[in-house]
Each structure stands twice: as C-alpha cells, then as structure tokens.
C-alpha cells in the first residue's frame, strides 16, 4: 500500500497515468518491498535497481521528475531526491529556475541523472529521455576547460563560493566525469542503446584525453618528482588552490587516490603516466600517519567527540591534508589557521569533517598487479 500511495502521489504530480492504472501497478522489486523507494538514496535508485525495473511505471514516473528538473544548460542540481513526489509549488520553482546557476558535478550530480536516463531509455525507447541525455552530455563537454579540467559548478558561481570554478578533484568530481565519459565509449548496453554519433564519440574521446593530460599537468612536483594532487587546482595557473576556509592549498590524502586509480586503468600507459603513478605511490608510502583508531567518546555533557588513538592493531591512516612546504599533516578550523593536532581545532570542525582517510590502501593494493601488467620491475 505504501508503494502504491507513493506511485499515486507521483502520478498526480506529473500527470502521466490515471489513479486507477497506478493502483494496478504491483511492486516489481524485492528491494522496494523490504525497504521502500522513499527510504532509498536517489543515487541507488538511479543505478542499482534490477535491470528490468527500469522499464516499470515507477521508473517512468521518476524519469518525469528528472526531465522536469534538468537545467536549460543541460545539468542538474545536487542532493535532490528525484525519486520522491514533487508537489505543485516545488514544480513551479524548478520551472522558474531553469536558467539559474546551479547545475553541478558535486556529489555525483548530473552524472547520476544521466546514468538513470540511459537505464530507462534502454528499456522504454522514449525519445524524450534520449534528448535529455544528449543535452546532458553536451553540458559536460561544454563545461570542460581548454586545459582539460572541469569546475565543480558550471556556469561557475560567484562570491564566497567562487572556488567552485577551480578544477575540482574534491569528492572525486572530475574522476566521476572521466569515468562516465570512458563508459560512454564502452560496451555497456545502456550506453550503447543511446546510439551516440561517431562525431559525438570523437568529442567524448577528445575530452577524456584532455582530462588525462590535465591530471598529469596538475600533479604537484617536488624536487623534480611527481607526488600527489590538491583537492582543487586553479583553472588558469593549475596551482593548488583554496576552497572553503578550512580547505587550504595542500597535498590531498584522499582525492589523489581516485586520480591514480583512474590512471592505472589506462592500457599501454605512456612513460609520463607510469612516472605519475610511481611517484604518487612512493609519496603515499612515505606519508602514512601510522596505525590509528578513530573513536567517538561521550562527554560529560552528553555530546559526542572524536578522538584519535594510536593502535598497532589498527589499519594505516593518511591525513586528509598535508602542508605544501613541510609535507606534514595538518588540521584547520573555519578561521583558516593550520594546527598540528586535531585536538587544537574546535569541536564543530573536529567532528564535522573527515580529517583522516584510508583511501590510499586500495591504491597500494592494486599497485603490484599494475606493475606486473605493465612489465615494470
């Protein structure tokens, strides 16, 4: 009943089918039965449902929301639950803001919606989905800088959030774009169904190649050796750049990993790509902050606080940020002042940000196999 009520509400919003027809729909997936679509994350609904589900009336109704919310320029806003019903006032607001800045690649936005449209189109052949998909791909190509990088938002925002115009590796924004472009040229059935023209495929390949070149150009070089990357780089100078007040120019212990993993996927890598990977791996091998346990303790007033404990049985950790001069881990409050210890910053930032990461583990685990595959001793 819950899912039927959900479908009826969504149907009323977009006007696709009548209430009688909607109530005739039965649940098509065990995941929906056990958890309910409303309780799922949009990104999971978009790409992780059983293949047959994308032909369902539920999927078609959600596709109406995705069509409605696409910006005129071709992208989408972030953190929107497009699998939830959209009421009349919210629908009106979306229509009114079609031309406003807000389309982004942050938090998997735009890429998630395009994957969903491809999944639904492959099952329904509704040409509206293909048209929206094509506009979205064109948006990605338009947003790319001549140097191969992508901003977090396009068009770029102004004022205090102008950092969204930097080439953005933060939260794997550019890596996600690059992976999507690579998949567009693959044998994936959903993307094959879009029947991209040869000219469009050529543009996608060119954008991907420029993106790889951008990764190589932005890698921080220390004493002639390639090391890691910053979470964002200036779109003109390519230098490490500042984002929010506590996200200073630095070596990134997290975002660098996604870049290296993507470079490792390149077949027959060039000497420059090999040097990039080798340099990054060496840097991470030398910059672990040790075996740590990140605990949360309850304070006398009932609040929670994060503490870091050295533990020889715990996994290796790396810092989120490393100083560009000293290459030592640092922490930072909203005042933008670097601190040597997490205990030196305020409770809000100490507990509201990920200051440590284990992301390099995956890269280091894949490195021996990558060397063997490419004949590197």
Predicted regions and their residues:
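A cross-kingdom feature marking solvent-exposed beta-strand/loop segments within repeated
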Residues: 82, 86-105, 149-169, 190, ...
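Long, well-ordered core segments of solenoidal/helical folds
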Residues: 62-74, 132-149, 205-224, 276-293
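Long, hydrophobic/aromatic-enriched structural stretches that serve as scaffold segments
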Residues: 94-124, 132, 139
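Residue-level signature of the C-terminal ends
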Residues: 69, 120, 143, 184-187, ...
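Conserved small/polar residues in nucleotide/adenosyl-binding loops
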Residues: 1-3
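Terminal, non-catalytic domain-edge segments
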Residues: 32-62, 179, 183-210, 236-243, ...
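Bacterial N-terminal signal peptides
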Residues: 14-26
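N-terminal carbohydrate-binding/catalytic regions of secreted carbohydrate-active enzymes
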Residues: 56, 60-111
């Amino acid at each position: 009943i819950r899912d039927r009520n959900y479908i009826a509400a969504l149907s009323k919003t977009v006007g696709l089918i009548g209430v009688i027809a909607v109530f005739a729909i039965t649940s098509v997936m065990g995941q929906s039965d056990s958890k309910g679509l409303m309780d799922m994350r949009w990104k999971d609904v978009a790409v992780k449902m059983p293949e047959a589900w994308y032909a369902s009336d539920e999927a078609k109704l959600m596709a109406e929301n995705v069509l409605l919310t696409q910006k005129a320029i071709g992208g989408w806003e972030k953190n929107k639950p497009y699998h939830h019903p959209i009421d009349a006032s919210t629908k009106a607001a979306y229509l009114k803001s079609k031309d406003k800045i807000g389309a982004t690649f942050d938090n998997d936005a735009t890429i998630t919606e395009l994957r969903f449209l491809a999944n639904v189109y492959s099952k329904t052949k509704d040409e509206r989905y293909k048209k929206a998909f094509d506009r979205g791909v064109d948006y990605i190509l338009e947003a790319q800088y001549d140097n191969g990088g992508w901003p977090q938002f396009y068009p770029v925002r102004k004022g205090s959030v102008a950092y969204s115009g930097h080439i953005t590796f933060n939260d794997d924004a550019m890596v996600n774009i690059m992976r999507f472009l690579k998949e567009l040229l693959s044998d994936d059935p959903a993307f094959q169904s879009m029947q991209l023209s040869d000219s469009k495929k050529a543009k996608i390949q060119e954008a991907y190649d420029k993106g790889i070149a951008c990764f190589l150009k932005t890698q921080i070089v220390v004493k002639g050796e390639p090391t890691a990357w910053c979470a964002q780089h200036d779109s003109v100078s390519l230098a490490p750049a500042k984002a929010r007040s506590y996200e200073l120019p630095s070596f990134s212990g997290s975002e660098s990993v996604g870049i290296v993993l993507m470079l490792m996927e390149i077949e027959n890598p060039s000497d420059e790509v090999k040097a990039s990977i080798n340099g990054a791996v060496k840097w991470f091998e030398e910059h672990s902050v040790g075996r740590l346990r990140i605990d949360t303790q309850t304070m006398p007033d009932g609040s929670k606080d994060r503490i870091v404990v050295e533990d020889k049985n715990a996994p290796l950790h790396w810092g989120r940020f490393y100083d560009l001069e000293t290459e030592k881990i640092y922490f930072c409050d909203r005042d933008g002042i670097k601190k040597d210890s997490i205990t030196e910053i305020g409770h809000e930032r100490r507990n509201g940000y990920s200051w440590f990461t284990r992301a390099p583990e995956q890269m280091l685990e894949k490195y021996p196999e990558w060397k063997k595959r490419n004949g590197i001793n």
